[in-house]
């Protein structure tokens, strides 16, 4: 029995099909067609209503299929007509749009866009679908080639009965909490595995554990890479993209990826080849238009969130990893950008890589892009298998959505124990009724705890054993390939000296904006001018003038002892996340980083003090002679480097800005009071503090430089040869830095 269509809709669809047929047929019969005054074909049907135009992507796909194009004036005319004529395929009231199949049934060769397509190509072509997109530049809309894979070690990852526990220390006792319980699964090269679950379900913990970034002392079960345990060699084969985009805000996109390439790519590649790899990754990720834009941060404008995420991914795929792990790569992105990010991961997987990603709440389009799925709930495994079979599995145990909903939302509701819009399995309902508990009073449905217990038990009894048996199958690799996974030797991308040079240059570029900010320059120069005005051409021929000038020298010692300390304490705490990330990836040796970090500040640190002394020295009437001027500047430089060392040590020991600032304030205040200007006679039992004060030694050296020809003792301070003070400052310079380095060595890598 056939159903009758509404007469209006039927007639409308037939009329428009006939109009389209007549338009195209007339256009084919006449190379130039019948044109109106504006150059538009007279037979073209007018755009009616709110119909949709042929999409840009659809047009590109059609043009890509054309076997050839006309040339000459005819081509120009047809292209002009094509630009002016937008064929609108209006959806009729029945909701059915004119499909490509119906166009193919016309049996015609399309020419209104300036190219010919035989009927057989039309009939063989696929329907228009936005799901066929490949990663493209979001702004420019240009297709990008797939990730150009190079030969790499394939990694077959298996994990069986994985557990993870942490000890929570309280005031009087400690409690052991289980984060993961009996997680099993596998993922092979060419596959994308998604880890799904509500917040706090253990997704990030499992991801870090699979990446080898969690100490094995607190884990249980087995994790194998090509049937071999984790080794340090694998660090150079694993890419790990953190949830937060840990990037330097003042570096451009190109600089960020270039430095990553120079540090991480093997020594066999030249500097130019590494630079070219960075440019290739920029092109692969569609970042050409923003490659010279700063990354940006909380206080610096930069690239967009989607571009920043792609830079983070580029930092990892630049090494051509065998295993790529990503923590929430779509977090904070719009649906289109998120889809393109997942499609990019598919391209990487298709090149023979193993890809694992956590995902919080994907759209339905994203969900169907994953090959495998792990669903976690309260640290337990609720499902592992093909993502396309997840709904069938839960339907088989009696859990089906009662309303139309996103599959991912359905699974997350189950993982949370929320079954308000989900059918209640009869077995679960009977169990709750028999126990007279585990039921919510308001809805009358089983409680989240009862739902969770049922789902865990259902998976363990129906699926778990079968999946565990599959893990026993050997991986399809020869023994030589397997043996590569067990090498214990690390593979540094470059030698120690090159690591130092690269990190030194990176540090200069990143912090050049901080040192020459208008606020800092204004602060230093305004202080210098005020000092110059207060001590304008002071006269040391009188005792009062000599004492006043000694006060100026003490202020210089205090100012350039105080200023560097509170700048340096921020160094390591602010870069802790970056240091954790790069050390976990074995990008460089800690010693190379530490030396580069502490020396890259020095060239910039000497510019402002030099300007300060040039203003103060000549305005206040200090000894006008090259010898005392340069000795005074050298003394201030020694004070700055020693004070920096103290700030670095405090910051590295505490790694907390609030605590470090408090401790630095107390320490600097103590050193200032013990500096020999305020208190002339210090009690013996506490007099040793002055010898730890860089203010004290700097003050004595400045007095010697200025007044060694005038007096033996000034303001209660005896002037000697100054070697003791120089030696004390040098010991502080190296001693404080050694303490800071040892503190960093003891710092655990937090993932």
Swiss-Prot record:
Residue ranges crossing the lipid bilayer per the database entry: 516-536, 552-572, 602-622, 634-654, 666-686, 722-742
Keywords: ATP-binding, Membrane, Nucleotide-binding, Transmembrane, Transmembrane helix, Transport
A GO CC term assigned to this protein in UniProt: membrane
A biological process from GO: response to water deprivation
Primary location recorded for the protein, binned into one broad class: membrane
Top-level taxon: Eukaryota
Cell compartment(s), UniProt: Membrane
Matching SMART domains: AAA
UniProt entry tagged with the keyword ATP-binding: yes
Binding site for ATP: 197-204
GO MF annotation list: ABC-type transporter activity; ATP binding; ATP hydrolysis activity
InterPro entries hit by this protein: AAA+_ATPase, ABC2_TM, ABC_transporter-like_ATP-bd, ABC_transporter-like_CS, ABCG_dom, ABCG_transporters, P-loop_NTPase
Residue stretches making up the ABC transmembrane type-2 domain: 498-707
Membrane topology: Multi-pass membrane protein
Family membership: Belongs to the ABC transporter superfamily. ABCG family. Eye pigment precursor importer (TC 3.A.1.204) subfamily.
PANTHER family for the chain: ABC TRANSPORTER G FAMILY MEMBER 22, ABC TRANSPORTER G FAMILY MEMBER 28
UniProt name for this protein: ABC transporter G family member 22
Organism, scientific name: Arabidopsis thaliana (Mouse-ear cress)
UniProt lineage: Eukaryota, Viridiplantae, Streptophyta, Embryophyta, Tracheophyta
């Amino acid at each position: 029995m056939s159903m009758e269509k509404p007469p209006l809709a039927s007639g409308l669809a037939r009329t428009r099909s006939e109009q389209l047929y007549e338009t195209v047929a007339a256009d084919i019969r006449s190379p130039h067609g019948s044109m109106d005054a504006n150059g538009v074909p007279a037979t073209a049907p007018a755009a009616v209503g709110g119909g949709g135009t042929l999409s840009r992507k659809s047009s590109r796909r059609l043009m890509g299929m054309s076997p050839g194009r006309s040339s000459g004036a005819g081509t120009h005319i047809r292209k002009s007509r094509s630009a002016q004529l937008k064929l609108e395929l209006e959806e009729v009231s029945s909701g059915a749009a004119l499909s490509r199949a119906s166009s193919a049934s016309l049996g015609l060769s399309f020419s209104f866009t300036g190219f010919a397509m035989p009927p057989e190509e039309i009939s063989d072509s696929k329907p228009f679908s936005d799901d066929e997109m490949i990663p493209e530049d979001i702004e420019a809309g240009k297709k990008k080639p797939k990730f150009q894979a190079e030969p790499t070690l394939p990694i077959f990852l298996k994990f069986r009965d994985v557990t993870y526990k942490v000890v929570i220390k309280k005031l009087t006792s400690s409690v052991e909490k289980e984060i993961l319980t009996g997680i099993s699964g596998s993922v092979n090269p060419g596959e994308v595995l998604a880890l799904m679950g509500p917040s706090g379900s253990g997704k990030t913990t499992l991801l870090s554990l699979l990446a080898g970034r969690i100490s094995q002392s607190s884990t249980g079960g087995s994790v194998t890479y090509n049937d071999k345990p984790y080794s340090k060699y694998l660090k150079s084969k694993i890419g790990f993209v953190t949830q937060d985009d840990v990037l330097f805000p003042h570096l451009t996109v190109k600089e960020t990826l270039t430095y990553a390439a120079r540090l991480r790519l093997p020594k066999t590649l030249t500097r130019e080849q590494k630079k070219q790899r960075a440019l290739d990754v920029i092109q692969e990720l569609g970042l050409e238009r923003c490659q010279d834009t700063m990354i940006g941060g909380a206080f610096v404008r930069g690239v967009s969130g989607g571009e920043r995420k792609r830079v983070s991914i580029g930092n990892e795929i630049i090494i051509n990893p065998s295993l790529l792990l990503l923590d929430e790569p779509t977090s904070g992105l719009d649906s289109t950008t998120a889809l393109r990010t997942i499609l990019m991961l598919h391209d990487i997987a298709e090149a023979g890589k193993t890809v694992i990603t956590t995902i919080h709440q994907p759209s339905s389009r994203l969900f169907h892009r994953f090959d495998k799925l792990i669903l976690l709930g309260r640290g337990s495994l609720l499902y592992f298998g093909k993502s396309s079979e997840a709904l069938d599995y839960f339907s088989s145990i009696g859990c089906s959505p009662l309303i139309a909903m996103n599959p991912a939302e359905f699974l997350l509701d189950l993982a949370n124990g929320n079954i308000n819009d989900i059918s209640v399995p009869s077995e679960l309902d009977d169990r709750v009724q028999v126990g007279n508990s585990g039921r919510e009073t308001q809805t009358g449905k089983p409680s989240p705890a009862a739902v969770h217990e049922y789902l865990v038990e259902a998976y363990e009894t129906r699926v778990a054993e079968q999946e565990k048996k599959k893990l026993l199958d050997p991986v399809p690799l020869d023994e030589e390939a397997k043996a590569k996974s067990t090498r214990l030797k690390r593979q540094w991308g470059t030698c120690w000296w090159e690591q130092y040079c690269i990190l030194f240059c990176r540090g200069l570029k990143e912090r050049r904006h901080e040192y020459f900010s208008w606020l800092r320059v204004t602060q230093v120069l305004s202080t210098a001018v005020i000092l110059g005005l207060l001590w304008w051409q002071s006269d040391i021929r009188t005792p009062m003038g000599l004492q006043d000038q000694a006060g100026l020298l003490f202020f210089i010692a205090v100012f350039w002892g105080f200023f560097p300390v509170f700048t340096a304490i921020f160094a390591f705490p602010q870069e802790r996340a970056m240091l954790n990330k790069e050390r976990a990836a074995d990008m460089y040796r800690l010693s190379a980083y530490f030396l580069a970090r502490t020396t890259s500040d020095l060239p910039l640190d000497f510019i402002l003090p030099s300007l300060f002394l040039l203003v103060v020295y000549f305005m206040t009437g200090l000894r006008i002679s090259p010898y005392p001027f340069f000795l005074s500047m050298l003394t201030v430089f020694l004070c700055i480097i020693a004070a920096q060392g103290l700030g670095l040590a405090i910051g590295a020991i505490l790694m907390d800005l609030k605590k470090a600032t408090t401790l630095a304030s107390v320490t600097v205040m103590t050193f200032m009071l013990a500096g020999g200007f305020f208190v002339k006679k210090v009690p013996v039992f506490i007099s040793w503090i002055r010898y730890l004060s860089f203010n004290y030694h700097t003050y004595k050296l400045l007095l010697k430089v200025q007044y060694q020809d005038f007096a033996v003792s000034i303001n209660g301070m005896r002037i000697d040869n100054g070697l003791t003070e120089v030696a004390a400052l040098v010991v502080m310079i190296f001693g404080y830095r050694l303490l800071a380095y040892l503190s960093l060595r003891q710092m655990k890598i937090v993932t």
